[in-house]
Design a protein with these regions (language model features):
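Penicillin-binding protein/beta-lactamase superfamily catalytic region
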Residues: 183, 200-245, 249
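Active-site-adjacent helix/loop patches that line small-molecule binding or acyl-intermediate pockets
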Residues: 19-26, 94-201, 227
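Short active-site loop at a secondary-structure junction
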Residues: 45, 60-78, 95
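Structured C-terminal helix/loop/strand segments within mature extracytoplasmic catalytic/sensor domains
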Residues: 229-340
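Active-site SXXK
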Residues: 71-88, 108
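Short, flexible loop/turn motifs enriched in small residues
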Residues: 41-46, 75, 272-274
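Beta-lactamase-like hydrolase cores
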Residues: 19-66
Length: 340
């Protein structure tokens, strides 16, 4: 029995609920990646993907790329643009990259978040994101060995939440309730997402960090990333793209997929979102957005590599990401690879 009213056209929530959605829902995708062990296909990951050329025209697509999804953290660069437009000013481009980050909680991430808060006269108690351990396995193990536990700064969205608080200070808005969808900050961020995706937000939910998450289509998400990398130098959107590409390790981490991909492919902007989402763009080439339906992050990179190759990106370093090894007895016995 559904605890919330439902209709074939989408979820509808009563006033005061956590989400409001109107319009069609995501229909699901097609087989995009296969899991091959010892020569035997033991699984398939379905999903949707769209590749746009440098003009914004779709040159390849599969699955449902026009219905709304929650891009999750792939929306962060667009939200950062909204923060800059609302008054956020950060002299260090690495700090700007941190606002767009889903950082893995390594030492340098935690130090940078703490420094931003301290310079603003704040501490982590001002953050609405929940306490967490670092996402990076080595960083998490080090924290636990030292007797530490979950903190808000370690949570992977703490950079975004810090940016939101600093934006409120700059704009003269109250910090209280900055995460609520009706706060003037969130209204500005929603406007930025709608502008760059060229479509209205179809649903507003609550992300894992407690801030609003905005639903748009994969086509809209890809268009937004294309606009980020092809924006005029000096514009807020170009500043966001440039900061992320200049500091890829800040965006994710030493071992994060999007960080590794940006280090490997010149000019590439990439940002993952949980539930199997990633968006990427290369100036003068095009942009990609994809979602793996079952949320498996392991299938993202092989499909992204396939999409980049369809756009003519031939960087030799792509080969490292084209297949994800499967182990048996501690040695490779198969791989996850793209079907698209």
């Amino acid at each position: 029995m559904f605890p919330i009213p439902w209709s074939p056209l989408g979820w509808t929530f009563p006033k005061g609920g956590n989400v409001h959605a109107v319009g069609k829902t995501y229909e699901g995708g097609v087989p995009l990646a296969e899991v091959v062990r010892s020569g035997f296909v033991e699984g398939v990951h379905r999903g949707s993907v769209v590749a746009l050329d440098a003009t914004g025209a779709a040159v390849a697509k599969a699955g449902d790329v026009t219905s709304p999804i929650f891009p999750r953290s792939s929306n962060k660069p667009l939200q950062t643009v909204g923060m800059i437009r609302a008054g956020l000013r950060l002299a260090d481009s690495a700090d700007l990259a941190l606002v767009s980050a889903s950082h893995e909680g390594e030492d340098f991430h935690r130090a940078r978040v703490g420094g931003l808060l301290a310079r603003a006269g704040l501490d982590e108690s001002a953050l609405h994101c929940p306490p967490d351990l670092p996402a990076d396995e080595e960083a998490r193990a080090a924290v636990l060995r030292a007797g530490g536990g979950p903190t808000r700064i370690q949570m992977n969205c703490s950079g975004k939440h810090t940016g939101m608080l600093l934006t409120c200070q700059a704009a003269g808005w109250p910090g209280e309730g900055y995460w609520r969808s009706e706060h003037p900050l969130q209204e500005r961020l929603r406007a930025a997402v709608e502008e760059f995706t060229d479509e209205p937000v179809a649903a507003v939910g609550i992300d894992g960090c407690g801030a609003p998450v905005l639903a748009v289509s994969l086509s809209g998400l890809a268009l937004a990333y294309l606009r980020l990398v092809q924006a005029e130098p000096g514009s807020p959107e170009r500043a966001v793209a440039d900061s992320m590409r200049a500091h890829p390790e800040i965006v994710g981490g030493t071992r994060a997929d999007d960080s590794r991909m940006m280090r490997a492919v010149p000019g590439l902007l990439a940002k993952v979102g949980v539930e199997g989402v990633i968006a990427a763009a290369v100036p003068g080439v095009g942009a990609i957005a994809l979602k793996i339906d079952d949320g498996a992050g392991r299938a993202r990179m092989p499909v992204l590599v396939s999409a980049l190759r369809r756009l003519g990106v031939t960087a030799p370093a792509l080969a490292v990401f084209a297949e994800v090894p499967l182990l048996g007895g501690g040695r490779p016995v198969g791989a996850i690879r793209s079907l698209w």
